[in-house]
Amino acid sequence: KHGHKGREWGAIIADPCCLGACLAPTLPVSLPAAGGLPTEFSSAQFRAALGMFATGVAIVTARGAQGQPVGLTISSFNAVSLEPALVLWSLGHTSTALGIMRQASHYAIHVLTVEQRALAERFATRGIDRWAGVAHQPGRSGAPLLAGAAAVFECRNRSQYVEGDHTIFVGEGLHCTHQPHSSPLLYHGGMFYTEHPLGRVAESALG
C-alpha cells in the first residue's frame, strides 16, 4: 500500500484465495485474450478499494553491492507455497530501492509487531537515513536482521516478475523464526491497527 506524501511503501497484493498458503495443484490455465472491457475506475478509486483489504506490515532488508544496508516498509507480503517454502512481495518501479533489491542475492522479511510502528514509519520515509540508530546484525545470508519482529524470513531472491508498474519478488525461505504471542501491526485504509481476537478459525476453513 502507499502511505502519505513522503512515504514509500510496497504495494498491496489482495489475494483472498485462502487463509494459509495456496496449495492447489498446478493445472493448465487458458488466459483470456488481451483487451476486453474497458476500465471503469480511476487509479485513486482502485487504490482506495484495495485499501479495504487489511494487511500486516513488514520491512524487507538487504545489502547493496557495496555492503550498505537497505530496507523498506511493505504490506504486500504473502505466502505462495509450503513445499518448497516460497513467499512473495512487490515493489513499485518508482522505489529508490528497486535496483538494489533486484540485484540482491538474498533478503530478509520482518513481520512487524504493534510495538514497531515507529520503525514501520521510519522505513517508509524518503530522504532520511533509515538506519541511523537502528540496531541490526547480519543474518545467515548477510541480510541485516532487525530485533523484535513477530517473524523473520531469510530468503534467497529466487525469481522476479514485472507486472504493470511493479516487480513481484518470489523468495525461497532458507531460515525463519517467530514469536507466537506477539501482537501484529496491521494496516487498513491508510491507518495502523492491531488485533482484536474474535476466536480461532475453524479447521474446515483453513486452506
What are the residue ranges of the model-derived segments?
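Basic, polyanion-binding surface patches
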Residues: 15-207
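Short hydrophobic alpha-helical segments enriched in small aliphatic residues
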Residues: 3-5
